[in-house]
């Protein structure tokens, strides 16, 4: 064994000796691999890093990215060949302690909130992966992404608002 601490060694010994705990660990590993696979296939909505996006490109995946101007909008779509869909939201994150990403409909009604997202205060943007599975099946629609700084008391300050005008181009249910 090459465990770093005595606690690690004790846990490892237990996992090898206890079939039930070993089986549970196997289930957790399978779950983690499944989540990683969904993320790599672009099927999850999550915050990602430039490094993650670069790795996907290096692996040969077709990554479609949209970066609407701060406070502005952008027309967007996906094709059958796209593997991953990334939104790049520029904002001054330097004074934020906590950031939430809200996805709203065209009437500014919040549909999804990713609370306390990972971010780098020195970065000039937050990158999020929209589910490519959803984007390929979605009807033409408008989504407004809002980055909010949230203080300790729960107060919110708008860091940026970005509008995505999605046009469906793939045939199927929901197509025009």
Residue ranges and their predicted role:
Residues 99-102, 134-160:
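Short, aromatic- and glycine-rich surface loops/edge beta-strands on solvent-exposed regions
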Residues 68-95:
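Contiguous beta-strand segments within globular domains
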Residues 93-105:
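Solvent-exposed loop/turn segments flanking beta-strands in beta-repeat/beta-sandwich domains
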Residues 15-63:
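Short alpha-helical interface segments
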Residues 82-85, 127-133:
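Charged, amphipathic alpha-helical segments
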